Amino acid sequence: MAKGKDVRVTIILECTSCVRNDSKKELAGISRYITQKNRHNTPSRLELRKFCPYCYKHTIHGEIKK
């Protein structure tokens, strides 16, 4: 049986460059990835370098609140 809260939680990673450069109107949107993290191993917010199809380069994607 499971004890307490689930250890693995689903998180959303959002491109930090697209959020800051929102003034550009040619951008079609903001890149987001859905993944999971282990709450015990990574209690702080997760940041990963992922490919952003709107910036056309690898950028830092940070964890956002649901």
Curated annotation (Swiss-Prot):
PROSITE patterns: RIBOSOMAL_L33
UniProt protein name: Large ribosomal subunit protein bL33c
Lineage, broadest ranks: Eukaryota, Viridiplantae, Streptophyta, Embryophyta, Tracheophyta
The UniProt record lists the keyword Phosphoprotein: no
Pfam families: Ribosomal_L33
NCBIfam families in alphabetical order: PRK00504.1, PRK00595.1, rpmG_bact
GO terms assigned for molecular function: structural constituent of ribosome
Signal peptide interval: none
Predominant localisation class: plastid
Keyword Ribonucleoprotein included in the entry's annotation: yes
Stored PANTHER family: 50S RIBOSOMAL PROTEIN L33, CHLOROPLASTIC (PTHR43168), LARGE RIBOSOMAL SUBUNIT PROTEIN BL33C (PTHR43168:SF2)
Subcellular localization: Plastid, Chloroplast
Assigned keywords, A-Z: Chloroplast, Plastid, Ribonucleoprotein, Ribosomal protein
Assigned protein family: Belongs to the bacterial ribosomal protein bL33 family.
GO CC annotation terms, alphabetical: chloroplast; ribonucleoprotein complex; ribosome
Organism: Lobularia maritima
GO biological process per UniProt: translation
